[in-house]
Design a protein with these regions (language model features):
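Beta-alpha-beta core module
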Residues: 142-148, 152, 226-275, 283
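Hydrophobic hinge/microswitch elements
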Residues: 117-118, 129, 198, 203-257
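A short LG(V/I)-centered, amphipathic sequence patch enriched
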Residues: 29-46
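Secondary-structure junction motif
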Residues: 179-184, 188-212, 278-282, 286, ...
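Short helix-boundary/capping micro-motifs
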Residues: 1-17
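Alpha-helical linker/hinge and terminal dimerization helices associated
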Residues: 31-32, 53-75
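Central regulatory/effector-binding core of bacterial HTH transcription factors
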Residues: 79-142
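Flexible hinge/capping segments at coil-to-helix
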Residues: 144-193, 197
C-alpha cells in the first residue's frame, strides 16, 4: 500500500486479489492496535502512524537484505554484492567509471546500482536498501558518514542559437541600450527546463532564479537525457551539471550561457550510514579513494 498507493495497485503487484490485500491490511491494523490507513476519496491514504510504520518496515526489510548479503560475503568474500544508489547525473556520468574499476579488481562481486533523484537516494540509504550513495551535500539532520568528495559545477546551457541571442542581449546592455535589453530581461523571457520535484538540481535552479529575481515560465522534464535533448532543440535553457552535458558542449550541440552567478560550485559526496561498511562497500570506498576523481572529505564547513 505504501508504495503502490492503492489496494488495487498493491494486489496487482503482489498478484493476489484485492480482498486478500484488504484482509491482510485489516489484520495488520488489529496487530498494531491502531489505524494505519484512512479513506481518501475513492482510495486509501496512510495515516501519520501508517507513515511511521511503513518507514520502519522499509528499514527492517533493508537490514534483512543487508544481513543476508553480509553473511554471504563472509562465507565467500569474493562473491559479495555491492549495493549503491546515486542521483541521476552521478549514476549516468560518475559511478559507471568507478564500478568499472571495482569490477576489474573484484570480478566475482555482484553490483546493484539504483538511480533516482535526491529524495529517492536518501530514502534508499536511510532504509538500508543500499550501502553507499553518491549525492549532493547532505541536508542538515541527515545522520550520514561522508567517505569522499568530488567537485563539480552547475552551468546554464541552451542551444547554440539561444546562446548567441544571450550574448547579443548582454552586448546590447553593455552598449547602453535600454528597455528590454540585457541578460536578465532576456533570461526572464526564456522557458527554463526543470527536473522533477525532489531533484537537487531543481532546487538549485529555483534558488538561482530567486537570486536573479526573475520568474520565467518553466517546463518540468523528468530525466537528464530529456533535458539535454529539449535544450538542444531550443525548447529553453537549463541549469545542469557540467558532467551531464560534457559531450554536448564539446560537440557544439549545446552551448554554455554566461548567466550572472554561474557556474555554481558544488560537490558530489560518497555517503554511507554510520555503521561498519559491508566488505564490498568498503572495497569500493578504498577503490574510490585510490582514483583521481574523488578525494578525502575536508573538515566540516
Amino acid at each position: 500500500m505504501a508504495e503502490a498507493g492503492s489496494v488495487r495497485a498493491a494486489a496487482e503487484q503482489l498478484v493476489v486479489t484485492q480482498a486478500a490485500v484488504s484482509a491482510s491490511l485489516a489484520a495488520l491494523q488489529r496487530s498494531v492496535g491502531m489505524p494505519l490507513v484512512r479513506p481518501d476519496g475513492r482510495g486509501l491514504r496512510l495515516t501519520s502512524a501508517g507513515e511511521q510504520y511503513a518507514a520502519y518496515v522499509h528499514r527492517i526489510l533493508g537490514l534483512l537484505d543487508e544481513a543476508r548479503l553480509a553473511a554471504a560475503a563472509a562465507a565467500d568474500p569474493e562473491r559479495g554484492e555491492l549495493r549503491i544508489a546515486a542521483v541521476t547525473t552521478a549514476a549516468e556520468q560518475i559511478v559507471p567509471r568507478l564500478l568499472s574499476g571495482f569490477r576489474r579488481a573484484h570480478p566475482h562481486s555482484g553490483v546493484l546500482l539504483e538511480a533516482g533523484n535526491r529524495d529517492r537516494v536518501r530514502a534508499l540509504l536511510e532504509h538500508h536498501q543500499v550501502d553507499l550513495a553518491v549525492a549532493g551535500r547532505p541536508e542538515p539532520g541527515w545522520d550520514v558518514q561522508v567517505h569522499a568528495v568530488r567537485a563539480h559545477q552547475l552551468v546554464v546551457v541552451g542551444s547554440p542559437e539561444l546562446a548567441a541571442r544571450a550574448r547579443a542581449a548582454a552586448g546590447a546592455a553593455a552598449a547602453g541600450e535600454t528597455g528590454d535589453a540585457g541578460m536578465l530581461p532576456w533570461l526572464s523571457r526564456q522557458p527554463w527546463l526543470l527536473r522533477e520535484p525532489g531533484s537537487g538540481t531543481r532546487l538549485s535552479t529555483e534558488a538561482l532564479l530567486a537570486d536573479l529575481d526573475i520568474t520565467p515560465s518553466t517546463l518540468t522534464v523528468g530525466s537528464n537525457g530529456a533535458i539535454r535533448e529539449s535544450a538542444a532543440v531550443g525548447l529553453g535553457v537549463t541549469l545542469v551539471s557540467r558532467d551531464a552535458v560534457a559531450q554536448e558542449l564539446a560537440s557544439g550541440r549545446l552551448a554554455e550561457i554566461a548567466v550572472p552567478g554561474t557556474p555554481l560550485h558544488r560537490d558530489w559526496y560518497l555517503l554511507a550510514n554510520p555503521d561498519p561498511l559491508p566488505l564490498p562497500a568498503a572495497r569500493l570506498v578504498a577503490h574510490v579513494l585510490g582514483s583521481s576523481d574523488f578525494q578525502l572529505p575536508g573538515p566540516p564547513a
